[in-house]
Curated annotation (Swiss-Prot):
Keywords associated with the record: Cytoplasm, Pentose shunt, Schiff base, Transferase
Predominant location: cytoplasm
PROSITE patterns named among the record's database cross-references: TRANSALDOLASE_1, TRANSALDOLASE_2
UniProt source species: Actinobacillus pleuropneumoniae serotype 5b (strain L20)
Name the record gives this protein: Transaldolase
Gene encoding the protein: tal
Amino acid sequence: MSQLDALREMTVVVADTGDIEAIKQYQPQDATTNPSLILSASALPQYASLIDDAVAYAKARSDDKAQLLIDAEDKLAVNIGLEILKIVPGRISTEVDARLSYDTKATIEKARQIMKLYNDAGISNDRILIKIASTWQGIRAAEVLEKEGINCNLTLLFSQAQARACAKAGVYLISPFVGRILDWYKAAEKKEYAPAEDPGVISVTNIYNYYKQYGYQTVVMGASFRNVGEITEIAGCDRLTIAPPLLKELAESNAPLVRKLEYKGEVKTRPAPLTEAEFYWQHNQDPMAVEKLAEGIRKFAVDIEKLEAMLAAKL
């Protein structure tokens, strides 16, 4: 049995890509996209018709240049999601514009808009996750959306404070990042880490155990991996979203895989929710989390602007 097949027996495997051919090859349960992956996918020739459709959709809705871009961008992300949903049996995660990460109201409106595009294409809410950055404002938006039946995937999650706030808000799923945490520590500490000592692995393990210890139903989906060792060290996590090169490596390995995450203790009484002040104080005690959250939002915003430049040339 390959490591990938062994992993599927203990964890829901998700493909972290917008590449339809890769998704067909590895047959994940779900798929996740983000602005960077949408940008990469848009360069593939098989997506040309999806771009043309998004442009035509935008032109039919507005004459305003700024609105045209917004509409085309949303429709393209949904078009790619629709293609992926023809292959995966589960859900697609589609991300809200990262530039709205500190605006609760705008995030809610954008999420509703994305979901409407899917609904108009005949896709029900239970096949979509709306990805939102795990800022205080994003978490508050997700809290509202979950009550409306719009499930959310809270991404760019690096701190225990973010994880606690997401759990209390009742979000459907969180994506704690592994590899980006490792990147920060390697740069800061000037050292290499064995998989079991990887700070990203330790972070996800702690979050997983915290959620199970207090009986939270929020799904923990480890994300952002730099090597297979990070994946095997958190085998047993609820879900793992994995890029095609690492899916390939797992599929080609027959090394034994041991389940690492499994909580068997008692469920305890939940702690009081964090106030906004407590959230910021605790999150800001972790310089890695502060820097990586801000950097992640900036990077996604840059790729959104590149995507808009590509679309603007066609509008």
